[in-house]
Structures are given as C-alpha cells and as structure tokens.
Amino acid sequence: MASQSTANPNVLSLATIGSVARLLTLTGATLTTGLISGFFYAYACSVSLGFALLPDEQYVEAMQAINATVRNGVFTFSFFGAVLFLVLALVIYAPRMRSLRFLLIALAAVLYIGGGFMATFLINVPMNQELALVSSDAAPATPAQIRAEYEGPWNFWNGVRTVFSSLSFLALIGACLSRSDSG
C-alpha cells in the first residue's frame, strides 16, 4: 500500500514562512532606511540651503517650527522603523551569518544605528531641545549669536547622519541584490 502524505497543501510550511519573514524584514529595513536617508539628504541639499538665506531671527524661528513638527507618525515610522527592521533582519538572517546578504545587513545596521541614529539622538536632538528653549523675548543671546553656535554644528552633524544613513541604504540595496543567502 502506498504511503499517503498527511501534509495539508493549504498550510504554509515553516520554510515558506521563514522566506516570507526574511523578505519582509529586508524590504522593511531597506524602505525605512531609504526614507530616512532621503529625509536627511533633503534637509542637507534644500532645507538648510534655504534657511541659510534667512535673517537670523527668522532662521531661529524656522528651525524651532520644524523641530516642533518633525516628530510625527511618518517620521517616527522611518526613523525608528529602520532600527527595528534592521535588528529583526539581523535576527532572522542570523542562521545565515556567513552569507554575503547577512554581512551586508550587519554592515547596514552598524552604519545606520552607529552613524545616523546615534548622531541624531546624541547631537542633533539635544541641539534642537536647546534651541526650543530660546525665546525671542527673553533670550540672553541675540539671534545672531544663537545661530552662530547652532547652524554650523547642526548642519555638520546632519551631513554625518546623511552619509551614514545613505551608506546603510546602499548596503541594504546590495543585500537585496545579493544572490548569496547561504554561507
């Protein structure tokens, strides 16, 4: 008598679920990292250049307004989502840690978390918080002094996080294109 398989063809196999999980986490990491690197890039090549043309008082007010509104759901999804998806991708691809794909994901995680994410948290956000405390009525420093201390360093560190986030995005594109999923 021939043995019949008891597997239900309508049930996804663990291998299929694993493949889908790997695809979704790598796609999520690539998408969110691309979005946030594009956000930082747009700031560097348009917003900062436009703000450079503003008089000092308007510059301070404009930066305060943007900093007050940037914390929203769309930004949160890309900024924190990149960390979440990168970590998930590392965990899911860990059994394939000798593969080129895993190494590129690990490189992307180090670049984004160590460069883009941490620069934002350790430097740009504290600078933004200090700027938020400045009141045009009660400021001990003039808008020109405030701007002189803020603009150059803030733009420099935005450039740093732009470069690191963009390199992370490129590493993830490499991971997506890699045919090596075993090692």
How should each PLM-predicted stretch be described?
Residues 4, 9-13, 35-80, 126-152:
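Interfacial loop at the N-terminal end of multi-pass membrane proteins
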Residues 17-33, 91-115:
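Interfacial segments of alpha-helical transmembrane regions
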Residues 31, 80-84, 160-163:
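Hydrophobic residues within alpha-helical transmembrane segments
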Residues 34, 87, 114, 170-173:
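Hydrophobic residues within the alpha-helical transmembrane core of Major Facilitator Superfamily
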Residues 40, 86-93, 120, 172-176:
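Structural signal for membrane-spanning alpha-helices in multi-pass inner-membrane proteins
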Residues 76-90:
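Hydrophobic alpha-helical transmembrane segments
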Residues 107-129:
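Hydrophobic alpha-helical transmembrane segments of integral membrane proteins
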Residues 162-182:
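A hydrophobic membrane-anchoring alpha-helix module
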